[in-house]
Amino acid sequence: MSTLKMMLLILLLLLPLATFDSDGQAIPGGGIPSAVNSRVGRLLGGDEKSGRSLEKRCSSGKTCGSVEPVLCCARSDCYCRLIQTRSYWVPICVCP
């Protein structure tokens, strides 16, 4: 085997071991700063740390759903039901 072929074979075998600039995350930290993420979470649904949770802001005290958007029912004797749309389930309040 010629020297050139041997060098090409060695380079091809070592190519998977090489690291490139495109390996790993393009933006360190995932692209969304945690301060912005927590602020958006507080504005949408509140959290325990801010003291503005939906349960405290809901006048009836009855909420439906555990994932955003969480609904505030009109009355406390309502119950939650899930209805299926085309691609996902949506919580609704059913009041007798």
Curated annotation (Swiss-Prot):
Modification comment: Contains 4 disulfide bonds.
Keyword Signal: yes
Propeptide residue span(s): 21-57
Subcellular location: Secreted
Signal as UniProt keyword: yes
Any one cellular-component term (Gene Ontology): extracellular region
Residues in coiled coil: none
Chief location category: secreted
Keywords recorded for this protein, A-Z: Cleavage on pair of basic residues, Disulfide bond, Secreted, Signal, Toxin
Domain of life where this protein originates: Eukaryota
GO molecular function ontology, one term from the record: toxin activity
Tissue-specificity statement: Expressed by the venom duct.
Signal sequence bounds: 1-20
Domain writeup: The cysteine framework is XV (C-C-CC-C-C-C-C).
Family: Belongs to the conotoxin N superfamily.
Name of this chain's protein: Conotoxin Mr15.1
Species, as recorded: Conus marmoreus (Marble cone)
